[in-house]
UniProtKB/Swiss-Prot annotation:
<dbReference type="GO" id="GO:0009102">
    <property type="term" value="P:biotin biosynthetic process"/>
</dbReference>
<protein>
    <recommendedName>
        <fullName>Biotin synthase</fullName>
        <ecNumber>2.8.1.6</ecNumber>
    </recommendedName>
</protein>
<dbReference type="GO" id="GO:0004076">
    <property type="term" value="F:biotin synthase activity"/>
</dbReference>
<dbReference type="GO" id="GO:0005506">
    <property type="term" value="F:iron ion binding"/>
</dbReference>
<keyword id="KW-0479">Metal-binding</keyword>
<comment type="function">
    <text>Catalyzes the conversion of dethiobiotin (DTB) to biotin by the insertion of a sulfur atom into dethiobiotin via a radical-based mechanism.</text>
</comment>
<keyword id="KW-0001">2Fe-2S</keyword>
<dbReference type="InterPro" id="IPR013785">
    <property type="entry name" value="Aldolase_TIM"/>
</dbReference>
<keyword id="KW-0004">4Fe-4S</keyword>
<dbReference type="InterPro" id="IPR007197">
    <property type="entry name" value="rSAM"/>
</dbReference>
<comment type="subunit">
    <text>Homodimer.</text>
</comment>
<dbReference type="GO" id="GO:0051537">
    <property type="term" value="F:2 iron, 2 sulfur cluster binding"/>
</dbReference>
<comment type="similarity">
    <text>Belongs to the radical SAM superfamily. Biotin synthase family.</text>
</comment>
<keyword id="KW-0949">S-adenosyl-L-methionine</keyword>
<feature type="domain" description="Radical SAM core">
    <location>
        <begin position="53"/>
        <end position="282"/>
    </location>
</feature>
<dbReference type="GO" id="GO:0051539">
    <property type="term" value="F:4 iron, 4 sulfur cluster binding"/>
</dbReference>
<feature type="binding site">
    <location>
        <position position="75"/>
    </location>
    <ligand>
        <name>[4Fe-4S] cluster</name>
    </ligand>
</feature>
C-alpha cells in the first residue's frame, strides 16, 4: 500500500472500532508495523476512539511503595528481585500512619485513586496488616478509590480484600504468554491469570497490563493486548522498560518513541472501552513526545513517583492534560 492507501485503511479500521467491531490479531499487528510516516495519522484516529468511548477526562492514580525489595522472584526487568544487585530501596511494610499520611496527601491534590503496592511473590505474613490498613484507609480517607498490588493472591485472600473495602486489584500479565518464560522462571503466566480471575470473581475491578520493550516482538504486544481483552480487565497500565543497572535487562536497547506511541494507539483500538493508563518509563523513554500519547489514545496515568524510579510530578502531568484541553 502507498501512503494514501495506508491512511485510508487506518480510517476504515478506526471507524469499524467506533461502530462496535473488534480487530483481529492480523489487523492489529499490521497497524503496529506501520511506518513512522503514518504514525501521526494513526494517533489521531486512536484519539477519536478515546473521545468516543471515554470523553475528555483523564483518570489519575497514585501509588505508595509500601514494602520494598527482597522479592523471591526473578523477573528480569525488576530492581526489587533479591537475586539481582541493584540500588533499589529495601524495607518492610510501612506503618499504617505513614500510608494514611500519603493517602491524605494524594487526596489533597485532587487525585481520587490510590494504590498500595508491596514487593514479593505474594502478601505473605503481612496480609492481616494489609487488611487492617485497607480498612483504616476506607474509614479515614473515604473519598479515595482503593487499589492494591500485592502479587499472587488466592480466592480467599481476594474475598478478604474485597470485604475490607478494596475497590480494585492490580496484577500485570507483564508480557505475552509466548514470551513470559524469557521474562520470569519462578512462577507461571497461568499463576497471574488465576490471580486476575480470583479478583474478578469476588467483584473487584482489575487493573492489569504489562511492560513493553523487554525484547518481545511487536506481535507479542498484540498477543498481550488480546489476552487482556479476553480477560475483560477494567484498566490496562502500559509500562515501558526503564533499564536499571544490576538487572539482566540493564543493556536492553530502548524502543523508538514512535513505536511506543503506535503500541499505545493499537492498544486503544483493540481495547476501546478499557482504560489505557500511562505507567512507569514514559518520562524516560518518550521525553517530550509523551504528550502525543495523551493525544493518541491514552486516557489515564499514574502520577507522582513509581516504585523505584521518580516520575515528573503531578503538577507537570496536570499541565500536560490542560494543554490538550483535557480534564483530570
Amino acid at each position: 500500500m502507498n501512503l494514501q492507501e495506508k491512511t485510508a485503511w487506518i480510517t476504515h479500521v478506526a471507524r469499524r472500532v467506533i461502530d462496535g467491531d473488534t480487530l483481529s490479531f492480523e489487523e492489529a499487528t499490521a497497524l503496529l508495523q506501520l511506518p513512522d510516516a503514518v504514525t501521526p495519522f494513526l494517533l489521531g484516529w486512536a484519539d477519536v476512539v478515546r473521545k468516543c468511548f471515554h470523553g475528555n477526562r483523564v483518570d489519575l492514580c497514585a501509588i505508595v511503595n509500601a514494602r520494598a525489595g527482597r522479592c523471591s522472584e526473578d523477573c528480569r526487568f525488576c530492581t526489587q528481585a533479591a537475586c539481582y544487585h541493584t540500588r533499589a530501596p529495601v524495607y518492610p511494610l510501612l506503618p499504617a500512619e505513614g500510608i494514611i499520611r500519603r493517602a491524605r496527601a494524594v487526596r489533597s491534590q485532587g487525585i481520587k485513586r490510590f494504590s498500595l503496592v508491596t514487593s514479593g511473590r505474594d502478601p505473605g505474613g503481612d496480609f492481616e496488616k494489609i487488611l487492617g490498613i485497607t480498612r483504616q484507609l476506607k474509614r479515614e480517607v473515604p473519598e479515595l478509590k482503593l487499589c492494591a498490588s500485592l502479587g499472587i493472591i488466592s480466592p480467599t485472600e481476594a474475598r478478604a480484600l474485597k470485604e475490607a473495602g478494596l475497590d480494585r486489584y492490580h496484577h500485570n500479565l507483564e508480557t505475552a504468554a509466548s514470551f513470559f518464560p524469557e521474562v520470569c522462571t519462578t512462577h507461571r503466566y497461568e499463576d497471574r491469570v488465576a490471580t486476575i480471575r480470583a479478583a474478578q470473581k469476588v467483584g473487584l475491578e482489575v487493573c492489569a497490563g504489562g511492560i513493553i520493550g523487554l525484547g518481545e516482538k511487536p506481535e507479542q504486544r498484540v498477543e498481550l493486548a488480546l489476552a487482556l481483552r479476553e480477560l475483560g480487565v477494567t484498566s490496562v497500565p502500559v509500562n515501558i522498560l526503564h533499564p536499571v543497572p544490576g538487572t539482566p535487562l540493564a543493556t536492553q536497547p530502548p524502543l523508538p518513541a514512535l513505536e511506543i506511541l503506535r503500541t499505545l494507539a493499537v492498544f486503544r483500538l483493540l481495547l476501546p472501552a478499557t482504560t489505557i493508563r500511562y505507567a512507569g518509563g514514559r518520562e524516560h523513554n518518550l521525553r517530550d513526545t509523551q504528550v502525543l500519547g495523551l493525544a493518541g489514545g491514552v486516557d489515564a496515568l499514574i502520577t507522582g513517583d513509581y516504585l523505584t524510579t521518580a516520575g515528573q510530578g503531578t503538577a507537570r502531568d496536570r499541565q500536560l492534560i490542560r494543554d490538550l484541553g483535557l480534564e483530570g
